[in-house]
Amino acid sequence: MMPTDVRAIDLMIGFPSAESRQKYDYLRKNLRDAESAEMEMPAEYMFKDIPDHKEPEDDAVAITLAAMDQCGVEIGLVGVQSDAAKRALRAHPDRFAASLEIDPNKITATVRQIREAHEEWDLKAVTTFPSGCNPPVPVSDRRYYPIYQTCIDLDLPIVANAGIAGPRLPSDVQDVMHFDQVCYDFPELRIVMRHGAEPWEALAVKLMLKWPGLHYMTSAFAPKYYPQAIVDYANTRGADKILYAGYFPMGLSLERIFTELPNVPFRDHVWPKFLRENALRVFKL
């Protein structure tokens, strides 16, 4: 049974925006179908009831904080690129932690960007979307390797999309098998797969069994759609490897997530680790 006294840590949360379409402009130049060009969020065809975006006069930080308080979320990991995130990190350092989204194609500039953001914002993670890079880059590519060493030097995990991309972009760069080489080459690196790893979720489990540093977070999936292989793994040998992450406000409301979560058949010992303890350890929160 899901406990009611564990304050969750959400490893993928953001802030509603009246101009949410603009934050996906970097992807649109690579999208080719007409329908995607009209979408506000390039993967919106996958989601029902996407949370309403705020009016220009609304306080985005207050909206997210209220949703967190309502659902028992103590800390949210947010990308430092938005103005709302910067305001939240300054005003509420006890409620928000910083991550940085990167594209490894400009290697030296990206390494410098990570180090500068870490110094300014006390980064807790570096994140990346291989299919969304321009051009796309598999996680096993040499362009990522200086990024990984920088993460090791700064004691940061790397979080990377795995599985078929939601936006209509080629997904071969997100084949889960790419992580096998990275784990071999960087045994000190903490790696977290995000966004499902489907249809290779069984392979993701095999690789997590093999590699101590490889983990999985449940971002962008409503709890009723968590892959069965992931739930089974958490309940057996993977209780320390599976971490909670939501997708508010990009595709899911916290209300929906926390309404569905109690129906996930995790064993009792898994819940505190899934909701909180694994995040504290892997992200050094």
Model-identified regions with their sequence ranges:
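Short, charged, surface-exposed secondary-structure boundary motifs
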Residues: I107-R112, K224-A229, S253
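Mid-to-C-terminal alpha-helical segments outside catalytic/metal-binding sites
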Residues: M1-L11, A18-Q70, G238-L243, G251-L285
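Active-site gating/metal-coordination segments in enzymes
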Residues: E74-I75, Q81-G166, P170-V173
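Hydrophobic/aromatic residues located in beta-strands of well-ordered beta-sheets
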Residues: A8, G76, F96-A98, I158, ...
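N-terminal cationic-hydrophobic initiation segments that often serve targeting/anchoring roles
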Residues: M68, L89-P93, H118, C183, ...
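Short active-site segment of divalent metal-dependent hydrolases/proteases
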Residues: F15-P16, I164, E198, M250
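Catalytic pocket-lining loop regions of alpha/beta-barrel enzymes
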Residues: K124-A125, C133, V137-L243
